[in-house]
């Protein structure tokens, strides 16, 4: 894998971390279709990663448990390993990220930053 940009935040005028991270060079994108899951695996080059998700339209189920993401059935609330439209997650190397939508199609973007602890 090419050199990756570690998770690092810009500084504000007082020297504190700003909200936005530096750009990443570990990015994935796809257009997923109704009921067909797509997946990507977190790289193994670092142990911990911050993973950011973007979707259009917002109707994407994401599963990071190792299972394939599924669309929920109508009816009562049930336990699930999938999450609807997570913004970002801290994941470990080798985690499988599975995504599925009930829309005709959904554009997804997955951006990752490795974390180095001192």
Where are these regions (language model features)?
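Short, intrinsically disordered N-terminal pre-domain segments
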Residues: 1-24, 114-118
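Gly/Pro-rich, tryptophan- and cysteine-flecked surface segments typical
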Residues: 2, 28-34, 109-111
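Surface-exposed ligand/attachment interfaces on beta-rich extracellular proteins
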Residues: 22-46, 104
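Short proline/glycine-enriched turn/loop motifs at strand-loop junctions of beta-rich domains
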Residues: 46-48, 54-59, 103-105
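Noncatalytic modules at the cell exterior or secretory-pathway interfaces
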Residues: 49, 89-108
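Short, surface-exposed beta-strand/strand-loop-strand elements in extracellular ectodomains
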Residues: 54-73
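Edge beta-strands of jelly-roll/beta-sandwich modules across compartments, strongly enriched
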Residues: 62, 104-116
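Beta-sandwich interaction modules
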Residues: 78-94
